[in-house]
Amino acid sequence: MLRVSRALNAIVQPAPLGKGAPPGSAGPAARTGPTGPVVIWNLIRRCNLTCMHCYSISADIDFPGELDTAAVMRVMGDLKAFGVPALILSGGEPLLRKDIFEIAGRAKALGFYTALSTNGTLIDAPLASRVHQAGFDYVGISLDGLQATHDKFRRKAGAFDKSLAALRLCRDLGVKVGVRFTLTQDNAADLPGLLGLVEDERIDRFYLSHLNYAGRGNVNRKRDAHFRVTREALDLVFARAWDAARRGVVKDFVTGNNDADGVYLLHWVRKHVPELDASRLRAILAAWGGNSSGVNVANIDNLGNVHPDTMWWDCTFGNVRSRPFSDIWRDTRHPIMAGLKERPRHVKGRCATCAYFDVCGGNTRVRAMKVTGDPWAEDPGCYLEDEEIAASPAPAFQV
């Protein structure tokens, strides 16, 4: 995940490097220190929607064998003892779990930063009140375009209106809310209008996710945004983030699932805002370190299986029913876990020779695996030109 606004604000209002790093950021200290990973927890696989890019291939049916309340509570205790700073409660649709607010309450009581990842369509006024009372630190709701586009992605007429209503209900109660948008060739044209909506509706955060090749996203990967379209989308997001930063407006722009974004941001700043200290920006991005899968980001699925991240369900390190998460996460006998924790990662192709490997970290291994069969091959989703990843003439920032 690239916290665009945080990076830009850090060079507009400089502070000592390493201060205020986001939970799960992939800085060197975080990689070697005692803090556990951010855990994205798919508590349930059932969902009232069947989205075209869903990585979990969720559907409106019950999936047997899911962790019950007691098991979830037990695992949370282990996660807390291991130093996990944040839980992202996801699905499926997590609000379909009858115990979701009990789980959220326990997470808050244990001191976790607790976020809810939802499609929003089930949130009416009473449920919004319960979300607010539960004390979620953040609620992310997906909007993959404007009305017609979003409803097509969701395969549900009226989904856009319900999700937008949920954003408004939660916002008006004082809950920090954000819009998640997965970029594809089919919805890129809606991005300017969606960014305008985020501004008009006073939404706290906008998260642009690149399409990752998991679940239905892999089935539909031919609809991934073309590289030119990807760059144009990022130009727009970066420009909005910079405009907010220079005006001192509190608005959080984030991108994810393509760690080349950090390198592209660095080039974008050099080109469009040359008065900023690009060498300091590079130092900040390098301290965050790019891809965090298997290191500072973890996933637990609905059955209790532990994965490197949410997109890699066909790579399992163990199950929290039979073994503590803390033991599973420290065990590097699995070759994928060992490779992800290795520094530097021994990736191949363009990734191996990239002059900005310290910023990107080798990008997303799932795409490489799905396209080539080799998890250490170059990421086919890297949209950077060869000259953009060659050695930079810019001097290194001295810390």
Regions found by a protein language model. Name each.
Residues 2-138:
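Conserved alpha-helical substructure of the radical SAM core
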Residues 63-67, 363-370, 393-396:
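Short cysteine/histidine-rich zinc-coordinating motifs and their immediately flanking basic loops
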